């Protein structure tokens, strides 16, 4: 059996307790189940067999209750009840569960619950509110950073000026090859040229695709002027043959001699490779014409 007075005489009255903290004015208790935090007979969780308190775990409040019936079972000594987040409903739960407890414990439980809810609300406000964080900086560091910023601006301006100058020289053709200069500017220019050439090639391909379906009429290159002239000469000869039927055989012989001379002339010229002067002599086709004469009407005339 548990005797509360005996426990208090051993622990509280000027005796040793591991949870006790002595000061010049008052003694405090470090036990987590202590309802007030003070070391006295009414608030001691060890010397009271019927006891209750409020604890907070991860933003949730719980009501812990201890009775003398569970004193022989340390693992099941405390009964825990979860309280509602609504303040009024939580107070009603405390009154319902602590009907037969002393009035002092009931009042202190309500007081402890109000304090816990207040600091939980304060924590939520602080987490939502933005706070300024002051970081001390020495003057030397500020001066150093300003100098670095100024140097960086000057270097950036110089780099831009050098890049423009190099691009102008490259466009003018001052450099035959790329030397040990900053290569980034040249790379940018080359990329732009490649993009321009790629766009031109794509335009040409599009034009070819557009013109692929068109139809055109083209002259025949195989037909030469000499062939056309030969056809014209044939027509002329045909016409002249109809007109010159009564011509004599002497004309045939003279034409044959002229043809032989013309055949010999190119053979003599072909021996050397001298350039030809004037117009080329076109060869005419050799044509043999046979004439038939009728003598019967003349004989009839003589007979008459």
UniProtKB/Swiss-Prot annotation:
Pfam families: Mak16 (PF04874), Ribosomal_L28e (PF01778)
Any one cellular-component term (Gene Ontology): nucleolus
Keywords: Nucleus
Region of interest (Disordered), ranges: 190-304
GO process terms (BP): maturation of 5.8S rRNA; maturation of LSU-rRNA
Keyword rRNA-binding annotated: no
Main localization, broad class: nucleus
Biased composition (Acidic residues): 201-211, 218-233, 249-261
InterPro entries: Mak16, Ribosomal_eL28/Mak16
Ranges of compositional bias, category Basic residues: 267-285
Keyword Nucleus: yes
Cellular compartments annotated: Nucleus, Nucleolus
Family in the record: Belongs to the MAK16 family.
UniProt name for this protein: Protein MAK16 homolog B
Gene coding for it: mak16-b
